[in-house]
Amino acid sequence: MSIYSMSKSALDMFTKCLALELGPKGIRVNVVNPSGVRTDFSQAMGVDKDSVNSLLEVTGSSYPLGRIGEPIDIANAVLFLASDECSFVTAINFVADGGALWGAPPPKLR
């Protein structure tokens, strides 16, 4: 876990440093930090599809938006950051995680 966490932190700081260096040339630099996203990665590593789907459903249900991310969710975040509508944004960590960073929603009261 420490190597993974340090790698993510390094990419975040690298983004900020590049944004400072390249901003004067009109180049924007941002990073997208997704949470769990439904892909074929685990199956390619040999994990059976039912186990993957079960884990994704449990994980997604703990997110405030109540679902796991889909590749299109991350693609849309990247598209937005690359668009003219986002032309004054640089050096940010765009968190596309369905609210996962903030934890599970509060339990429903009866």
Predicted regions and their residues:
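A short C-terminal helix-loop "cap" of Rossmann-like NAD(P)-dependent dehydrogenase/epimerase domains
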Residues: 47-63
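Active-site helix of classical SDR
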Residues: 7, 15
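Short, flexible catalytic-loop segment of classical short-chain dehydrogenase/reductase
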Residues: 34-44
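Short C-terminal tail/terminal secondary-structure segment
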Residues: 78-79, 90-110
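A conserved structural motif in NAD(P)-dependent oxidoreductases
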Residues: 63-74
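Catalytic tyrosine of NAD(P)H-dependent dehydrogenase/reductases that use a Tyr as the general acid/base
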Residues: 4, 12
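Alpha-helical segment proximal to the catalytic Tyr-Lys
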Residues: 20-24, 87
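Rossmann-like NAD(H)/NADP(H) cofactor-binding core
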Residues: 25, 30, 92
